[in-house]
């Protein structure tokens, strides 16, 4: 993995910082594991914008990544590592002994030729997936399920990991990167190790056009708008003279947005109380 700073041959190249991984496959992805991916432009089925700052960008195919890791007792070998335009992490194409191929998230340290396995009998080794009742306390894991059999939901982005800090009865306690402590059923699966490509955070796009290639549209400040468009808009000068709010008048910068009281009992400690 190399960090490359581009030379200032033009204004658009001056600030670009690239993350180059020579181990990534340079050819086409595995076609049977691709699906069409349509652009939403941030609109819902009514055509109304539900997520701002989304639109345009390069076409992509969706890679069918195996988040469940439920092919138990069959060893697999890593054929190659690949770039995935739909996520910050890299993915690995694995070939099982019965001939099936699947994509998985590529953990840190995994390389072509390595062997991996899933199931209760899998060894405690990076890349192996097994229920958390079989993983030692103190281990670092990623792609963690919140419900048994649902597939991994926690710690899937580049460099992400979770630590198992306790096991009590039918639950394990996890420490998330945010500092939050959370309980999850012991039969939920997790993959050992942390997600690779942690250097993703060091990249610098360098110009607005690079964000547009990724489907990210400009973010306009409310104070730069007119009063008809935003509560911060209008007035003389830059001060908007009130507590910051969203375009719809809801308080921002610190307001709690979580509303799922049913699962509050599984949160042992909030992230704000590190």
From Swiss-Prot:
One of its GO terms (molecular function) is rRNA binding. One of its GO terms (cellular component) is large ribosomal subunit. Pfam families: Ribosomal_L2, Ribosomal_L2_C. Residues 221-274 are annotated as: Disordered. Keywords: Ribonucleoprotein, Ribosomal protein, RNA-binding, rRNA-binding. One of its GO terms (biological process) is cytoplasmic translation. InterPro entries: NA-bd_OB-fold, Rib_uL2_dom2, Ribosomal_uL2, Ribosomal_uL2_bac/org-type, Ribosomal_uL2_C, Ribosomal_uL2_CS, Ribosomal_uL2_dom3, Ribosomal_uL2_RNA-bd_dom. It comes from the Bacteria. One of the primary rRNA binding proteins. Required for association of the 30S and 50S subunits to form the 70S ribosome, for tRNA binding and peptide bond formation. It has been suggested to have peptidyltransferase activity; this is somewhat controversial. Makes several contacts with the 16S rRNA in the 70S ribosome. Part of the 50S ribosomal subunit. Forms a bridge to the 30S subunit in the 70S ribosome. Belongs to the universal ribosomal protein uL2 family. This is Large ribosomal subunit protein uL2. It comes from Serratia proteamaculans (strain 568).
């Amino acid at each position: 993995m190399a960090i490359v700073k581009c030379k200032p041959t033009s204004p658009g190249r001056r600030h670009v910082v690239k993350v180059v991984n020579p181990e990534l496959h340079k050819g086409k992805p595995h076609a049977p594991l691709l699906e069409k991916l349509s652009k939403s432009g941030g609109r819902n089925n009514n055509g109304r914008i539900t997520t701002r700052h989304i639109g345009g960008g390069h076409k992509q195919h969706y890679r069918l990544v195996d988040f469940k890791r439920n092919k138990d007792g069959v060893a697999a070998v890593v054929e190659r590592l690949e770039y995935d335009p739909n996520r910050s992490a890299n993915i690995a194409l694995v070939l099982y002994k019965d001939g099936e191929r699947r994509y998985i998230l590529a953990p840190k340290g995994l390389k072509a030729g390595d062997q991996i396995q899933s199931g209760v009998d899998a060894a405690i080794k990076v890349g192996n997936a097994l229920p958390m009742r079989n993983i030692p306390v103190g281990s670092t894991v990623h792609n963690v399920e919140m419900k048994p059999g649902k597939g991994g939901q926690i710690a899937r982005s580049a460099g992400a990991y979770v630590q198992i800090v306790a096991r009590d009865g039918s639950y394990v306690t996890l420490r998330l990167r945010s500092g939050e402590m959370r309980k999850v059923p012991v039969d939920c699966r997790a993959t050992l190790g942390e997600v690779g490509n942690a250097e993703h955070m060091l990249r610098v796009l360098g110009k607005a056009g690079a964000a547009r290639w990724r489907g990210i549209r400009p973010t306009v400040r409310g104070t730069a708008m007119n009063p008809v468009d935003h509560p911060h808009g209008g007035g003389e000068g830059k001060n908007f003279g009130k507590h910051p709010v969203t375009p719809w008048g809801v308080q921002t910068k610190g307001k709690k947005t979580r509303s799922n009281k049913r699962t509050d009992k599984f949160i042992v400690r909030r992230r704000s109380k590190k």
